[in-house]
Design a protein with these regions (language model features):
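Polytopic transmembrane helical bundles with strong interfacial aromatic enrichment
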Residues: 1-312
Length: 312
């Protein structure tokens, strides 16, 4: 039965949190699939091969582990959406992202299948990754909104800054996926912060790599601003510190990928950490934006006070 605007139940909060953790795990396992070249470890879909699941092969095991996490996540996401529909239709900040996650499930599944059928073309893989991040964002937002206390909203300025950072963060993810699609990881050689001896761009893949770096610096600056605002008690303090920490760790992985270079084991590990780090940064930004609250929802939640007229 739908409940009035207010805090969600403990069971729902933990179910939503479990879904968010599973969604992050999916991104991390997807990174392992990419850096180990296991994307075609299962050449058929949804089964691994035409008749069986050959888990004795490393690539097949890694790829099918990715699909197993997907299956678990679908169950969790549908459960969250059904619960939200039945009990929290008065909480649009919980209901709509939960339903959006369900809508994104078939799109993401189709993209994954197409990627396998077409032998992993770069642009399909990149689009698959971007949609996967949108999927992660909707689930994380649902979980964070479910845990948010209605009586402790952040200031409107903090909320706007948080959402602005989310938008720039999504641009960073999209350009990063483009770097992968174009195989432009080494477009700047092993140079950082410079690119091919300078900072100017001269066309080609270097442009995309430089754009990716500039967006990363911008997100870092915005995350630092969020931390300053949060420490001044204008936003969630603990959550406000997470984005800058995640961004700094992620930038370290990115710099090491460039400096180390090569195609060795260390390079592969760093690439995997960079993909997982991207999911962590994105989740931290979305969670902070959700926890900062929606002033419109807060106003709607307050009871209307009517002052009786004084007879003259």
């Amino acid at each position: 039965m739908p409940q009035p605007y207010g805090e969600t139940s403990r069971g729902f909060r933990f179910l939503a949190l479990g879904s968010a953790l599973a969604a992050w795990a999916l991104v991390a396992v997807g990174g392992v699939v990419r850096v180990t070249g296991s994307g075609l470890g299962c050449p058929h879909w949804p089964l691994c091969t035409a008749k069986a699941i050959p888990l004795d092969q490393k690539a097949s095991f890694i790829e099918y582990s990715h699909r197993a996490v997907v299956a678990l996540l679908i169950v969790l996401v549908v459960a969250v959406a059904v619960w939200a529909w039945r009990s929290y239709r008065s909480r649009p900040d919980v209901l709509w992202p939960a339903l959006a996650a369900v809508v994104l499930v078939p799109l993401q599944a189709v993209l994954g299948a197409v990627a396998v059928w077409l032998k992993l073309p770069g642009w399909v893989v990149a689009f698959h990754f971007v949609v996967g991040m949108l999927f992660l964002g909707t689930i994380v937002y649902t979980a964070a909104a479910a845990w948010r206390r209605a009586e402790r909203p952040a200031t409107p300025g903090f909320t706007r800054l948080a959402w602005g950072t989310v938008l720039v963060g999504f641009a960073l993810i999209s350009v990063g996926a483009t770097v992968v699609a174009l195989d432009a990881d080494a477009a700047c050689g092993e140079q950082w912060p410079a690119c091919n001896g300078g900072f100017s761009v001269g066309g080609g893949h270097a442009d995309v790599q430089v754009a990716h770096r500039m967006l990363a610096y911008t997100v870092a600056g915005l995350a630092l601003a969020l931390l300053v605002f949060a420490l001044r008690a204008r936003g969630p303090r603990l959550a406000g510190s997470l984005p800058i920490l995640a961004v700094l760790i992620q930038m370290t992985f990115g710099i090491l990928i460039v400096v180390v270079g090569g195609e060795g084991r260390t390079h592969e590990i760093l690439q995997g950490l960079h993909v997982g780090g991207a999911g962590t940064v994105w989740a931290a930004l979305v969670a902070l934006a959700a926890l900062s609250g929606d002033p419109r929802a807060e106003r709607a939640a307050r009871p209307l006070t009517v002052t009786p007229a004084v007879a003259g």
